[in-house]
């Protein structure tokens, strides 16, 4: 006869336990991995711009001077870290897959950052739900698959990972946390300067408030003065590190502050006056998270511990609404006309996730699997709709081949002259720039341009001239008038709207490509291109090129080394009461 056994009592429901971070990263792989392998981000708005920058680093790592756009410009006008990683990986897997890999790393970093950031305010279970939500955010899918804002999706997670190290340093005076936090801040700044400026307030100030509030919590025993002093030390070291790592960027910015006429952008409009803007900048990136706004406001204002987080969310939300409210313009002044505001949706969503993690925990405690299924379905639909949105709201014209254009420019010495494209859109224009050896008068990164024909009219790229109305066409006419000065001999046209202007200005059609989709217009008597005085004065020195090729990417490598060599202190385990049966265990024989 076998020995007696004890009947098993009820177990702690799995829904009441935190979800392991490894499972959340697996979810990110399952959701975004196939989409990235399909290379869906390739068609996003800014993807080719990042690949254009990366292709230059792949060939000229220590020389950030790029001749291919604006008759020559310095890539020190844009922080380079993620583009340098794309350049490195491109030698192994090609440019397109390298972009996908670097974007995937950013996607994996986001739930890690959200989990660490949320733990400052909520327990491990709610933080794990917040991390799950970050994988399925509509704003993340919008920035990855529609806007192509690789820099924002890289910088934001790095700040989220860095700030908990500041929190530990300020409360516990742990030097390893200070070191890792400062290096991560430098790495985040090397990914994006705009996120640096705004994350310093939106993400960081609530954490500073919590460091003061929690100065006696757990094992910490700090004073208000001590927290403030350590905050100033962290701030000073971070500022010094960012100043050194991005020195070439700051030098160019101070030597050439942005004074050009503002360029219109839809994100500065009032979203509530046009349904397409409301869909593109409000409904799609926010998705089902809009349904949680009442809970965020009530919970965030009710609980003192959540108020700093809520205030950060509220500020980010006001900026995410762009020109729908006057607040961003009041705060930023003229700088309002320089920024675009779709990126602030991600910042606002991230600030809301810890509170929504509490909501998810409450709902699952009440309704169990029904709540889990409903929340999961809403999050999945939000992500799916944002991924599919470019199919219904295209941000560039129908695809066409530019291979013959590139081949023409790269043969028979044609790259001695400059060219522009008309009707290509910035996406295709950047593709041409990436693979040709010729230089263009046009360019895509607006902050890098210095030519007066482009800075004085308040229009964007020449290839999109007609979409900027009178200002855009006047800018194009000014460039055509000075074709001799710039060595502008070739114009590739994908929109017949421009052909009467070209014919009137003395250009003639010479060749046809891609079964008539593209025509080549040339002008006789144009001398070969030569350097322009506007651009050569901004050329980086060799020392700046050396700094640019080592410090930004070096900060990210150093951060990885420090995190590996100085592992985080293990958090105290959260205890669960062992479930005890209400009656004596039943003894029975096992047969």
What is each stretch, according to the model?
Residues 160-180, 188, 213, 217:
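Membrane-interface transmembrane helices that cradle and orient dolichyl/undecaprenyl
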Residues 70-72, 141-154, 258-280, 310-359, ...:
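Membrane-helix boundary/interfacial segments in multi-pass membrane proteins
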Residues 30-39, 60, 129-145, 241-260, ...:
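Membrane-interface helix-loop junctions at the exits of transmembrane helices
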